[in-house]
Curated annotation (Swiss-Prot):
Phylogenetic placement of the source organism: Bacteria, Bacillati, Actinomycetota, Actinomycetes, Mycobacteriales
UniProt xrefs under SUPFAM superfamilies: Class I glutamine amidotransferase-like, Heme-dependent catalase-like
Catalytic activity: 2 H2O2 = O2 + 2 H2O
Name of the protein in question: Catalase HPII
Record region (Disordered): 512-532
E.C. no: 1.11.1.6
Keyword set, alphabetical order: Cytoplasm, Heme, Hydrogen peroxide, Iron, Metal-binding, Oxidoreductase, Peroxidase
Keyword check for Membrane: no
Function, as annotated: Decomposes hydrogen peroxide into water and oxygen; serves to protect cells from the toxic effects of hydrogen peroxide.
Enzyme class, spelled out: oxidoreductase
Cofactors, names only: heme
Length: 706
């Protein structure tokens, strides 16, 4: 259950939510009308075996409410997880660009609610599918609610919102049999891609490791569109929004994703929840790319094109503030499911551009809430309520919670003293611009280069990231049944990069496509690679320590302490869950879980504890041996000390392993024969350094059977 935060000093939004909260673990059971009941297990009948009576209003209320508990799920982004927190600007450097106070008031913490999500799958689908991730943030500002409704990709698959229904129809389960669920690896999506080259840049992101985040806490977020900041004088500046995680950008491996989907389909939402509950609050830095209006046409692409990025090397990202998530919701449905984001929820100082995808989102998000949340009053739901004062002339409608007072509900009026009145300060004013032209159903020529940035993305990858992209295309297209679709996609890839197309074709058994005329001098953007960025922290990383009776208690406790000092989470896994293990030299070690019910894919690293009897038991257990082998195959740091080194040999790890008490680190396999109170701190240091790099990309494990 969620941590009890009632004693915390609440922010304005938490104070607002208090009026809607009630505790189920106190008081007496009542009906919806507040009538106490003394029996709820049997309906009212005539005698013990007679007919049930309709006059049992309590039973009818229970069943009727149950029958109506479900609401329509979101058409996209149905599966999600959310959390509360705050945003705080570093300084007032944006004051010259925007009138938005929450961006320009250092020391002011603006409450936020963030919802992360997958896109294609239904509400009950797995977290670790290959997909875009939603990253939507609701800022409860003093000037009203502002929603930054972004993704973990900076680009989208289409340029014009009129194509959104067909894109979603293509990626969703095919209509004749409702298969596959939460997957892009099927004919209709790739048929769409082969015929719509504007999708290719986003498809490159989808085939990359960016589509497989290790954690919501370890992925970037982007506003996708070019927005406009407007200052107090009405002057505009184009802006792109970026969220950068403090923990770095890290991903799972595709084989891990598929296994986690079965082992723990709630993997990402559980990770977010547990991190917040344990006080390891996720944090992101908000950055902006600013482009003066005079420079609108100085790029080789159109700023209004949502399938393009502004390379950070051309326009650096300016850090302007931080966001911290520090509270889990009290009720998933009431908060995470009923939260309603809308790209048109803006505040003074932030405005739109003529991005044709953004314009349709501004219509669609409001429209969809009307059916999903049962009418026009969804903004009154507790999670959606602004902390700013709300006074409108809109009234009535389903689920009206407010009780407006007074006779007038229109403007202008004299009966109500002219109120609610129009303000002349701190108001939203639409950006003033001249617009003229002929009515035409056509996109600008600057929108037509669909291959250049897709090529830039691929060329900016590290070798291992490029390998993963090739493998992803081969996997996805290998699931496509119609060979002509596979060939058509490969032909499109040839216009992105001939080597990419050739490698994918080879893996599919297709002839190498003819070489296309491509610009080999295409620029690269190092900022696009997440591997070259590395890492410098192991905070919240999960380490599994394998042990059994006879374990070296002193050495294990020492290692655990050294890792926890660095912020890692260490769990002892044994053949049986719970209880304690008897130490080989006395003492006991608490067991957290059993490795028979867990898996290496749920951890970032594995360590085998010392203790001859413990290691002997583990060596005879196929689960334990596979646990180590699988983690090794997935390039994770592996550690062993004392007799634990012997289990690595049993697991088939052929790296150089320690033969004495010196610490040896060979491709993130860290070993020493030292143990107990002689376990050197350098062992922990080397292991932590390897873990901070996330994986050892130099390790070749294709032949490892796991």
């Amino acid at each position: 259950m969620a941590t009890d935060h009632t004693s915390d000093a609440p922010d304005p939004k938490q104070r607002d939510l208090e009026s809607a909260r009630f505790r189920r673990d106190t008081g007496y059971l009542t009906t919806q009308q507040g009538v106490r009941v003394d029996h709820t297990d049997d309906a009212l009948t005539v005698g013990e075996r007679g007919p049930t009576l309709l006059e049992d209003f309590h039973a009818r209320e229970k069943i009727t409410h149950f029958d109506h508990e479900r609401i329509p799920e979101r058409v996209v982004h149905a599966r999600g997880a959310g959390a509360y927190g705050y945003f705080e600007p570093y300084d007032d450097r944006l004051a010259q660009y925007t009138a938005a106070k929450f961006l320009t008031s250092p020391g002011t913490r603006t409450p936020v609610f963030v919802r992360f999500s997958t896109v294609a799958g239904s509400r009950g689908s797995a977290d670790t599918v290959r997909d875009v991730r939603g990253f939507a943030t609701k800022f409860y500002t003093e000037q009203g609610n502002y929603d930054l409704v972004g993704n973990n990709f900076p680009v989208f698959f289409i340029q014009d919102g009129i194509k959104f229904p067909v894109l979603v129809h293509a990626v969703k389960p095919e209509p004749h049999n409702e298969i596959p669920q939460a997957q892009s690896a099927h004919d209709t999506l790739w048929d769409f891609v082969s015929l719509q080259p504007e999708t290719l840049h986003a498809i490159m992101w989808l085939m990359s490791d960016r589509a497989l985040p290790r954690s919501y806490r370890m992925m970037q977020g982007f506003g996708v569109h070019t927005f406009r900041l407007v200052n107090a004088r009405g002057r505009g500046t184009f802006v792109k929004f970026h969220w950068k995680p403090r923990l770095g950008v890290h991903s799972l491996i595709w084989d891990e994703c598929q296994k986690i989907a079965g082992k723990d389909p709630d993997y990402n939402r559980r990770d977010l929840w547990e991190a917040i509950e344990s006080g390891q609050y996720p944090e992101w830095e908000l950055g902006v790319q600013l482009v003066a209006e005079d420079d609108e046409f100085s790029f080789d692409f159109d700023l209004l094109d949502a399938t393009k990025i502004i390379p950070e090397e051309q326009v650096p990202v300016l850090p302007v503030g931080k966001m911290v998530l520090n509270r889990n919701p009290d009720n998933f449905f009431a908060e995470t499911e009923q939260v309603a984001f809308h790209t048109a929820n803006v505040v003074p100082g932030i405005d739109f551009t003529n991005d044709p995808l953004l314009q349709f989102r501004n219509f669609s998000y409001l429209d969809t809430q009307l059916i999903r949340l049962g009418g026009p009053n969804f903004a009154q739901l507790p999670v959606n309520r602004p902390v700013a004062q709300v006074r409108t002339n809109q009234h009535d409608g389903y689920a009206q919670h407010a009780i407006p007072q007074g006779r007038s509900s229109y403007f202008k009026n004299s009966i109500g003293g002219g109120c609610p009145a129009l303000a002349d300060e701190d108001v939203f004013r639409h950006y003033t611009q001249r617009v003229d032209g002929q009515t035409i159903g056509k996109r600008a020529e600057a929108f037509q280069n669909h291959y250049g940035q897709a090529r830039m993305f691929f060329k900016s990858m590290s070798p291992v990231e490029a390998e993963h992209i090739v493998a992803a295309f081969a996997f996805e297209l290998g699931k496509v049944e119609m060979p002509e679709i596979r060939s058509a996609v490969v032909a499109q890839l040839a216009r992105v990069d001939d080597q990419l197309a050739a490698q994918v074709a080879a893996k599919l058994g297709l002839p190498e496509p003819p070489e296309e005329q491509v610009d080999e001098s295409a620029p690269v953007s190092p900022a696009l690679s997440q591997v070259t960025d590395g890492g410098d922290t192991i905070a919240s990383r999960r380490i599994a320590v394998l042990a059994a009776d006879g374990v070296d208690v002193v050495g294990t406790q020492r290692f655990t302490e050294l890792m926890e000092q660095r912020g890692a989470v260490v769990e002892v896994l044994a053949p049986v869950a719970g209880g304690t293990l008897a130490g080989g030299s006395g003492g006991e070690l608490r067991v957290d879980r059993s490795f028979t019910t867990m898996a290496s894919v749920l951890y970032d690293a594995v360590v085998v504890a010392c203790g001859p009897r413990s290691v002997s038991t583990l060596s005879d257990d196929g689960y334990a041996v596979h646990f180590v082998t699988e983690a090794y195959k997935h390039l994770k740091p592996i550690g062993a000390y004392g007799a634990g080194v012997d289990l690595l040999r049993k697991a088939g790890i052929d790296n150089r392993l320690a033969e004495d008490t010196d610490v040896l680190n060979d491709q993130a396999v860290v070993t020493t024969k030292a143990a107990a109170d002689e376990l050197p701190e350098r062992f922990a240091e080397e292991f932590a350094a390897a873990l901070a790099q996330h994986r050892c990309w130099q390790r070749r494990t294709d032949a490892v059977p796991a």
